[in-house]
Amino acid sequence: MEPIPLPSYIHYELLLQLLERKTMFAVSPQSSQHQQVHQLIITLRKALAIQKQLEQSCERSNLAVEHRWSLNETNHREIKN
């Protein structure tokens, strides 16, 4: 069975760093946009936590997981096969 493709953690980290270091400071602290950015950060952190839970579940079920950097990796493999 092929490994289950999942996003590399760096994708989450890059988005979180951008939102926390740049976007939060670009919007007014008392604005609705500030609250939306805050909620987006929370959602990304939850998504990363859920992905880690999925990986643990796969490990317990002896299913391989492969962290992907891009969709191009998939296309490259499909071309090879």
Say what each PLM segment does.
Residues 1-30:
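N-terminal acidic leader/helix
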Residues 33-81:
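Low-complexity intrinsically disordered segments
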